[in-house]
Amino acid sequence: MAISENSRKYHEKMFPRYKSDFKRTDPEFIERFDNFAFDEVVNHDDMDDRTRFITILATLLGYQGKEEFKAMIPAAMNFGVKPVEIKEIVYQAVAYLGIGRVFPFLKETNKVFAEQGIKLPLESQATTTTENRLMAGEQTQVDIFGDGMKGFWKSGPAESRHIRYWLTDNCFGDYYTRKGLTYAERELITFCFLAAQGGVEPQLTSHAKANMRNGNNKQFLINVISQNIPYIGYPRSLNALRCVNDAAVEMEDQDND
């Protein structure tokens, strides 16, 4: 088996003039992987390349694939992902993965940007202040999840109510309100963070529903899962597929009520 022409062209656009040493050390493996990832998978559906790479970066963050993430930053930019969009993906990951897992990715992103001649810091994307982040976060939750989120931040048992407060003012008020990505794109990268890290099926199902409410329908989410199988493998992909199917059923049941 040889590397297909489609795979070769796609790889060249990702990494111009780069010659992988795997062709010398692991020729059988790299032929199968490249033909699968960069021909069979990318040509399976009509997802645009920019969206594909946004999901790949978010998935690699969730999966903690630091070396592959670093390699994919220039590739993503070659397919239309802007530096500010890459930074927004990294920033939002903190709310879902924690700074302990995101810190190395932020450092690697800055290194790649420096190598690419991208001046830091990038233009500010913040739209909230300390004074209005709570109310802005609540409005964002309502916009994404529906009117049932009104007053969410002050509900629940007293001993844990502060966590809901933080979810509203920090996760949504600090991150989701930023410019650089749309609500639909922010829900999409959250879906990728959760699908890739695994073990958070209730949250993944909830955010699959939020994606569907914001224009990322069931088939689109299945396409996202499919496009990222080369990066996270089959077990977590199949778990994510189950969550998407469950979310679609729950959405249909709600529509029938």
Describe the predicted segments one by one.
Residues 206-208, 214-228:
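Extended hydrophobic/aromatic segments used for targeting, binding, or gating
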Residues 51-60, 89-90, 185-195, 204, ...:
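Short, structured motif recognition centered on aromatic/hydrophobic residues
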Residues 57-60, 65-71:
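Long, hydrophobic/aromatic-enriched structural stretches that serve as scaffold segments
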